[in-house]
């Protein structure tokens, strides 16, 4: 008599140790799971709600300055080291891991207008209202030694900004003109100017390192070529630009922080139209800095908040504010793309998470898998009204909220006036101007 026996391979269901999870057989045939989409929708909704519950972006406040923080700089090789310059001429070096100040330098008389590090991280440069450029060692002096600069350059005018070349021993300063300096010389190797107004900021391109951009008080953004020692082109906007920042991953893209509450992302090959206009701030934008990934940037504003924008979106994905934080003067995104630092005029430097609900520290494999799964679910259902409303909701201070309502009314009034003008004019006599082109006055080559 032949008997047929059911047999299973123990490797398919027996755990190796009692700490392992029980293996559960699953059949992924869609016909057997008719309610898969409703289940995923509920999971996406719960994941979105939990993201808002765990959104605690504020990490630390670094206090010690006796005046407003005017500028920040990152160490090119050490993630934990940050430099800050204040309005009383004091420069401090901070350790972000220990969250304390490790060195204090009285660098200038008056404001520290700019600070930048050398590309190798051995020294840093500062400029101030006392018409000097000073180079300092990154490592402090020995016990009993006085704090002295390595090198001091006495200028003829006030310098308002400084930036170092990404690969060579060359740096640029700005004031009445843009000067290019060799570190070993006390006179500029070349000077470039276009116009007569003072220049507030200068930045080297991190990819095409011979290119640099500057913004002036006469509403210009000027691009220079260091090899030819001449200006290339300039774009004139409606209002003054405070600073610019180059995209670290795309050589031709830069973002300008403007006085008209907007940020403009330009492609330097076609300056007549911005790639994107970023609108959400309700006061002048004072500083901007890119994430190392080049996908997002953070902006600091006079409206006492900082916002994180995706490069390809006109609206911010995140806004950070606190009760005590006043006008935010400077902002930096750390080199590991995880944290944001901002300096404000109530003398504090604040440290934030780049992703408000991110869990810090080492994640287990199951935590990583759950995080990735929830992220995919949120992307899949992001346009559903209920999920979209929860994901976009932010608590704002009353001052910012009321200004947003006021700006919305003004914008609607302008739109209505434009529509009426077109309606009651001869067809074709009133041109339609897109939002992107409205703010560009001219491009000069």
UniProtKB/Swiss-Prot annotation:
Which keywords accompany this UniProt record?
Acetylation, Nucleus, Repeat, Ribonucleoprotein, Ribosome biogenesis, rRNA processing, Ubl conjugation pathway, WD repeat
Keyword Repeat on this protein? yes
- In terms of domain of life, where is this protein from? Eukaryota
WD repeats mapped onto the chain: 64-104, 107-146, 149-191, 194-234, 236-276, 280-319, 323-362
Record PTM N6-acetyllysine, positions in chain: 49
InterPro entries per the UniProt record, alphabetical: Sof1, WD40/YVTN_repeat-like_dom_sf, WD40_repeat_CS, WD40_repeat_dom_sf, WD40_rpt, WD_repeat_DCAF13/WDSOF1
Q: Which GO terms describe its molecular function?
A: nuclear estrogen receptor binding; RNA binding; ubiquitin-like ligase-substrate adaptor activity
Q: Which pathway?
A: Protein modification; protein ubiquitination
- Give the UniProt subcellular location, in the record's own words: Nucleus, Nucleolus
GO terms for cellular component: cell junction; centrosome; Cul4-RING E3 ubiquitin ligase complex; cytosol; nucleolus; nucleoplasm; small-subunit processome
* CDD domains reported in the protein's UniProt record: WD40
Pfam families referenced in this protein's UniProt entry, alphabetically: Sof1, WD40
Tissue specificity note: Expressed in the endometrium during decidualization. Expression is down-regulated in preeclampsia decidual tissues.
One GO process term, biological-process aspect: protein ubiquitination
Its family remark reads:
Belongs to the WD repeat DCAF13/WDSOF1 family.
Q: How does it assemble?
A: Part of the small subunit (SSU) processome, composed of more than 70 proteins and the RNA chaperone small nucleolar RNA (snoRNA) U3. Component of the DCX(DCAF13) E3 ubiquitin ligase complex, at least composed of CUL4 (CUL4A or CUL4B), DDB1, DCAF13 and RBX1. Interacts (via WD40 domain) with DDB1. Interacts with ESR1 and LATS1.
The free-text function statement in the UniProt record for this protein reads: Part of the small subunit (SSU) processome, first precursor of the small eukaryotic ribosomal subunit. During the assembly of the SSU processome in the nucleolus, many ribosome biogenesis factors, an RNA chaperone and ribosomal proteins associate with the nascent pre-rRNA and work in concert to generate RNA folding, modifications, rearrangements and cleavage as well as targeted degradation of pre-ribosomal RNA by the RNA exosome. Participates in the 18S rRNA processing in growing oocytes, being essential for oocyte nonsurrounded nucleolus (NSN) to surrounded nucleolus (SN) transition. Substrate-recognition component of a DCX (DDB1-CUL4-X-box) E3 ubiquitin-protein ligase complex that plays a key role in embryo preimplantation and is required for normal meiotic cycle progression in oocytes. Acts as a maternal factor that regulates oocyte and zygotic chromatin tightness during maternal to zygotic transition. Also involved in the transformation of the endometrium into the decidua, known as decidualization, providing a solid foundation for implantation of blastocysts.
Identification of the protein by name: DDB1- and CUL4-associated factor 13
Q: Which organism is it from?
A: Homo sapiens (Human)
